[in-house]
Amino acid sequence: KDGKWTFYFPNGRIEKCVNYKKDTLNGAYLVMNADSTINTIGNYQSGKKHGDWTWYNENKSLEMEGGCTEGLQHGEWKYYFSSGELSYNANFNRGARSGQWTYFFKDGTLFKEGKYLNDQKEGLWITNYESGVLLMTGVYSKGKEQGIWLNYWENGNIKNKAEFKNGVLNGAWVSYSPNKNILLTGKYKNGLKSGEWKTFNDKNKLLLLENFKVIKSEDSKNEIIVIGRNQE
């Protein structure tokens, strides 16, 4: 095949217009719906997607749009809810997620945002409630949670404080009530509860004291047992 080729629906309307060069897609590429609205529009170069591409959903609203190079997503892309509102902005570097990614609720309020490096989450990421109030914040390193992560009540007070190492819970854990009283304290070791854990009511009264010990089971997997419990 060479040059422009046009395909038709049984009703005679155009289904697709494409261009070939020596049997390879090359040039403008257009796909239509049966009602003659656009489904997909883009461009090929030597058989691979190249340049700007746009897709529309069944509601005739934008579904996604962005650029390609040698068949790979490259640069900024935008994705939309089926009702037409912007869902998220994304960035790619030759097919790999790279740079800022920002997600939105339908009303445009920021949902979550952060960065990718070499297709992995990197640095500070935040997540919000639909009201716009901060829900969660923490740092990624090579795609894994690292350091202190904070989870918030919708009134802005801290709900949980946790420590991670290479994506696994390691270190202190503290849970708080909406009015800042401590509800739970303890430590994790390699993702499992370890040592003394205390549970309180919202009036700071100790309700439960537990001690955890990690042992190796017969199949060499870590198991956790409660070796002491004192319930008030």
Predicted regions and their residues:
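Glycine/tyrosine- and acidic-biased, solvent-exposed loop/turn segments at the edges of beta-strands
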Residues: 1-232
